A protein has these predicted regions:
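Conserved donor sugar-nucleotide recognition element shared by glycan-biosynthetic enzymes
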Residues: 11, 72-75
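Active-site proximal beta-strand in glycosyltransferases
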Residues: 92-94, 110-157
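Short aromatic-enriched loop/helix-cap "lid" or pocket-rim segments at secondary-structure transitions
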Residues: 12-13, 40-45, 59-63, 105-107, ...
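N-terminal subdomain of nucleotide-sugar transferases
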Residues: 1-39, 44-47, 87-89, 113-116
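N-terminal strand-loop element at the rim of the active site
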Residues: 25-73, 82
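Conserved beta-strand->loop/alpha-helix structural units within folded catalytic cores of enzymes
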Residues: 1, 9, 96-98, 104
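Short N-terminal targeting/anchoring amphipathic segment
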Residues: 82-102, 116-120
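Membrane-proximal helix-turn-helix segments that form the acceptor-binding/catalytic region
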Residues: 112, 140-185
Length: 185
């Protein structure tokens, strides 16, 4: 699972190159949201399911971006249909990124269907609302306890305080859903 089906940064490079390498010995699927699709994936037999969404920052409809960036039932249903074709005993769902176009709603599916789930963390969004343990406004490392009152009232986000509040809501949803997964490794 990765936001993009192409390399647009370090995390996507790891996700796509891992999928290409694993495809030499295993049946590999890449579930993603943002096109284009890296043609190397299909050349080595990776089955790509790319739903063709825009990432949150580039969706012109800001209301849709704000709401679908927190929880996306449409994408969740597509992911659920994919997992219904796989065996929870024989499959591992490997998450790379889900904060630019996908959402934690996918973890609700892995929990419900009892899939083993692996997460490669490329940032700190599982632990810090702004993803960096960093106060971007003061240009210094942040030592606040994530999601504490001190954290939530601090304007530390790289973009804006409303963005920080939105990210905090997203993190609360994410942590709630991830806690339901009994097989996250």
């Amino acid at each position: 699972v990765n936001d993009c089906a192409h390399i647009e940064g370090g995390a996507a490079s790891v996700a796509i190159n891992s999928a290409i390498g694993l495809a030499k010995h295993y049946s590999v699927y890449l579930f993603s949201a943002v096109q284009p699709i890296d043609r190397r994936l299909e050349e080595v037999g990776v089955r790509v399911i790319c739903i063709g969404k825009k990432d949150i920052l580039h969706d012109e409809n800001r209301i849709r971006a704000i709401s679908k960036g927190l929880w996306d039932n449409e994408t969740k249903r597509v992911f659920e249909r994919l997992l219904a074709t796989l065996s929870p005993v024989e499959s591992i769902i490997h998450f790379h990124t889900w904060t630019k176009a996908l959402t934690a709603s996918l973890y609700a599916v892995t929990a419900k269907m009892d899939f083993k789930t692996v997460i490669t963390l490329h940032d700190f969004f599982c632990f810090c609302p702004n993803g960096g343990f960093y106060d971007y406004q003061r240009n210094e490392i942040c030592f606040r306890k994530p999601m504490s009152y001190s954290c939530l009232t601090c304007n530390c986000d790289v973009r804006s305080y409303p963005q920080k509040i939105w990210r905090s809501i997203r993190m609360a949803i994410q942590n709630h859903v991830m806690a339901k997964n009994k097989k996250i490794y």
